[in-house]
UniProtKB/Swiss-Prot annotation:
Residues 81-84 are annotated as: G3. Mg(2+) binds at T26. Monomer. PROSITE patterns: G_TR_1, G_TR_2. Gene3D superfamilies: P-loop containing nucleotide triphosphate hydrolases, Translation factors. Residues 19-26 are annotated as: G1. This is Elongation factor Tu 1. Residues 136-139 are annotated as: G4. NCBIfam families: EF-Tu (TIGR00485), PRK00049.1 (NF000766), PRK12735.1 (NF009372), PRK12736.1 (NF009373), small_GTP (TIGR00231). Residues 10-209 form the tr-type G domain. It is found in: Cytoplasm.
Length: 400
């Protein structure tokens, strides 16, 4: 009898190419798919297929992003590449393309440029944890000392933004030459470098922890009472797992978290013993009155998340064309901040030397909410005014 094919499920990692315009990010993306396709690990994508990325909308913001997928011997990758600089800014701030690591592409012929710096800063701010460097256009640099100089410059720049500049893997090659050759052989002077780069990505960027292995958290979407049983909070489990009889905390919209026990779990009217990340559930809570829990709070594993009012964030302000504001805003601007399931009013404080923020800008700001919310670094939010989105942000540091 015919045996079913054994398919090993490889660990999945999200990565992306970042770096200055015209340094070769898209060419490298095409080269990676071309070289790996020769080994049966990818579908070859042409430069123009990647470059003409479709428009997507994330939180009302228009972003052009190309998604390609490929495998190495060890892992499966989803890779994002953006045609324009503004697309990177929006992508990284909205978290439309969450990256577990990034390949920073720097032209060896030009060295680090303004967007190189800006992308490294953004990666630091929004929590891209690991960077691997590809020094592109190495075929245009004859002087090995110049190559070393550029590498040192990139390492210093990474260290400036608190990446381990001395440890970061750096591979020099030519994406264009590899793309033109496309033999995919390890001993090829061009294709070999692409394989070497992917080896470094395999080794250096760790496989991320799966959502289900993180501590339990569920944003509360709705609350109702079951006569004779008690109060039920419904929502989608964002991460972790929860079992009947476990203790949880209700966090947010009040100064201190409140403990309770989950005494029942339901999904689609069926009773569950356990719910995991991605499940839409109703959780029956012991001793909690209907008035003591509301939308906008979260249920969480005790001690894993706290309510906060003051924090720093990196934000992108929508342009008029994206449906955002037509005019700048100033220090003391009071919009709503939409976290998970609810709007909370807050005040924006601009950094010193920044007079105003124009539509289309990205800027680091300080926010003070009027009521505490369950917040942690890396949490995404929308800035809204009268029900329409005028900006997107990510929490970069918590003050109190």
């Amino acid at each position: 009898m015919a045996k079913a094919k054994f398919e090993r499920v490889k660990p999945h990692v999200n990565i992306g190419t970042i770096g200055h315009v015209d340094h070769g990010k898209t060419t490298l993306t095409a080269a990676i798919t071309t070289v790996l396709a020769k080994r049966g690990l990818a579908q070859q994508k042409r430069y123009d297929e990647i470059d003409n990325a479709p428009e997507e909308r994330e939180r009302g913001i228009t972003i052009n992003t190309a998604h390609v997928e490929y495998e190495t011997e060890k892992r499966h990758y989803a890779h994002v590449d953006c045609p324009g600089h503004a697309d990177y800014v929006k992508n990284m701030i909205t978290g439309a393309a969450q990256m577990d690591g990034a390949i920073l592409v720097v032209s060896a012929a030009d060295g680090p440029m303004p967007q190189t710096r800006e992308h490294i800063l953004l990666a630091r701010q929004v929590g891209v944890p690991y960077i691997v460097v590809f020094l592109n256009k190495a075929d245009m640099v004859d002087d090995p000392e110049l190559m070393e100089l550029v590498e040192m410059e990139v390492r210093d720049l990474l260290s400036t933004y608190e990446f381990p500049g001395d440890e970061v893997p750096v591979v020099a090659g030519s994406a264009l030459k590899a793309l033109e050759c496309g033999c995919g052989k390890e001993d090829c002077p061009w294709c070999g470098k692409i394989l070497e780069l992917m080896d470094k990505v395999d080794e250096y960027i760790p496989t991320p922890q799966r959502d289900v292995d993180k501590p339990f958290l569920m944003p509360v979407e709705d609350v109702f009472t079951i006569t004779g049983r008690g109060t039920v909070a419904t929502g989608r489990v964002e991460r972790g797992r929860i079992t009947i009889g476990e203790e949880v905390e209700i966090v947010g919209l009040m100064d201190a978290p409140r403990k309770t026990v989950v005494t029942g779990l339901e999904m689609f009217r069926k009773v569950l013993d356990e719910a995991v990340a991605g499940d839409n559930i109703g959780a029956l809570l012991r001793g909690v009155d209907r008035k003591e829990i509301e939308r906008g709070q979260v249920l969480a594993k005790p001690g894993t998340i706290k309510p906060h009012r003051k924090f720093f964030a990196e934000v992108y302000v929508l342009t008029k064309e994206e449906g955002g504001r037509h005019t700048p805003f100033f220090n003391g601007y009071r919009p709503q901040f939409y976290f998970r399931t609810t709007d909370v009013t807050g005040v924006i404080h601009l950094p010193e030397g920044v007079e105003m923020v124009m539509p289309g800008d990205n800027v680091k700001i300080h926010i003070e909410l009027i009521t505490p919310i369950a917040i942690e670094e890396g949490l995404r939010f929308a800035i809204r005014e009268g029900g329409r989105t005028v900006g997107a942000g990510v929490v970069t540091a918590i003050e109190e």
